[in-house]
Amino acid sequence: MSTVQVPKLNTKDLLTLEELTKEEIISLIEFAIYLKKNKQEPLLQGKILGLIFDKHSTRTRVSFEAGMVQLGGHGMFLSGKEMQMGRGETVSDTAKVLSQYIDGIMIRTFSHADVEELAKESSIPVINGLTDDHHPCQALADLMTIYEEINTFKGIKLAYVGDGNNVCHSLLLASAKVGMHMTVATPIGYEPNEKIVKKALAIAEETGAEIEILHNPELAVSEADFIYTDVWMSMGQEGEEEKYTLFQPYQINKELVKHAKQTYRFLHCLPAHREEEVTGEIIDGPKSIVFEQAGNRLHAQKALLVSLFKNVEELS
């Protein structure tokens, strides 16, 4: 660890990327790249991370559990349905009890307000592994992937096409923080949350970022360096069949990507539904870096875990 310093973060928790400065984000990315090359650094020897899941997961659960093992610690799976919190115990009581047993909490749930309360009432770090409003760990890995490809955020255009969901929200805040140009194209009625857009625009004024919310996918991807999409049906929305027709013009396909730079790269947070939000030709083609992106969840989260745990140690 002599060549790379553990980033010092001015926060106990990570609930949204709004809580981090541009400098902290860059430091986390550089630290994540270091950990990617040095997988078995035992920086969290003996530490226990509680993993609370109210939603199904592949990447989030496996990457956090594997990350804790590689860092010398342990990830403890906790099903939200099986905990007393699922039977009426308050979030506040749960936070205080878990703070007596373990060293940190990662939670993947529905209500962002519950995660905020969990963080407020706990004395240990709390990481938002996904809520209906935000997915900061995914956005941090996305920034790492972009940084590895181009080594800068200045002058980079990221185009997000599809549903203005939690992933889109976190990408808006992330892009605003690091000074990127981000365009979002959604059907009318599926725009990202207005309050989050306003926050991103306010941050962009300070950082020089450019944020655009559009309804024209061709305009959104015009001269883009990166094109990003997500599933049209998020968990719990599977019955909204009319969305398929409405979203069809927003499919990432060979015609749409002609408007981007020839050197563009394709991103997707996964899981993907081929021939819906993206064609197999694109996601399985040479421009796609979705599996490198998925792999970076592990490394970005390890950097975050070490930084948050070390900060709490120094403060205690």
Swiss-Prot record:
Localization in the cell: Cytoplasm
One GO cellular component term: cytoplasm
Residues holding L-ornithine: 166, 230, 234-235
Top EC category: transferase
PROSITE patterns attached to this UniProt entry: CARBAMOYLTRANSFERASE (PS00097)
Annotated InterPro entries: Asp/Orn_carbamoyltranf_P-bd, Asp/Orn_carbamoylTrfase, Asp/Orn_carbamoylTrfase_sf, Asp_carbamoyltransf_Asp/Orn-bd, Orn/put_carbamltrans, OTCase_ArgI
Pathway, per record: Amino-acid biosynthesis; L-arginine biosynthesis; L-arginine from L-ornithine and carbamoyl phosphate: step 1/3
UniProt keyword Nucleotide-binding, yes or no: no
Keywords assigned: Amino-acid biosynthesis, Arginine biosynthesis, Cytoplasm, Transferase
Biological process per Gene Ontology, one example term: L-arginine biosynthetic process
Domain of life: Bacteria
Positions of carbamoyl phosphate binding: 57-60, 84, 108, 135-138, 269-270, 297
Family annotation (HAMAP family): OTCase
Family: Belongs to the aspartate/ornithine carbamoyltransferase superfamily. OTCase family.
Function: Reversibly catalyzes the transfer of the carbamoyl group from carbamoyl phosphate (CP) to the N(epsilon) atom of ornithine (ORN) to produce L-citrulline.
Protein name: Ornithine carbamoyltransferase
Gene transcribed to yield this protein: argF
